[in-house]
Amino acid sequence: MKRLVAIVCLVMVTMSSALAQQAKDVTNNKSNMKSFKSTAWLLPQPVLIIGTYDKEGKPNAMNAAWGGQWDMHEIIISLGSHQTTDNLAVNPELTVAFATAETMVASDYVGIVSGRNTPDKMEKTGWTIEKAPNVNAPVFKEFPMTLECRVKQKIDESETGYYLVAEIVNILCDEKYLAEDGKPDVEKMKLITFDPVHHTYIQLGKTVGKAFSDGKQLK
């Protein structure tokens, strides 16, 4: 009987020790994770250049990061009140280009100054501007790929801005940025993303895998 009690006690001590170690490990793991207050740190964020015309046909561009795919043929962008929203009120068509390492400085510039009080804003970018073939909006030729879009919906519209849902009418891509399969080659474009944590731009790197394919090895 004493031997049985001793065995039970040994098992309990062993289990307690294991549980204590497990709790210690969990505590240690938690200590390695620092908490931050809620903020706009969705990573990575795109660097979208929105092109519009005002009522007199003068081109404007702005830099936007809060945007993404809304549906197969639609995008959504969060817009504050800008010259861009003024333009879209009279001409609901736009282009959306993707900023690159080469266009970074001017792309940042159009996000810093407003077309409302900077008459020569576009001249300072040095960009080559043409009218888009399918919508009434400007195309900036220095960008490798541009979406031609039409406004479809404005969500939660107020004096401070709204969420813009736009239909993709057509996609333009410079031929020198096409891959062997004839489709846009993202690596060639040297696109940049916005780091909202440190307020920097980061160039996209190399391909590391095949989507909807590489994960099958874990099935």
Identify the residue ranges that each predicted region occupies:
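Positively charged n-region of N-terminal signal peptides that target proteins for export
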Residues: 1-4
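Basic, polyanion-binding surface patches
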Residues: 21-219
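Bacterial N-terminal signal peptides
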Residues: 6-17
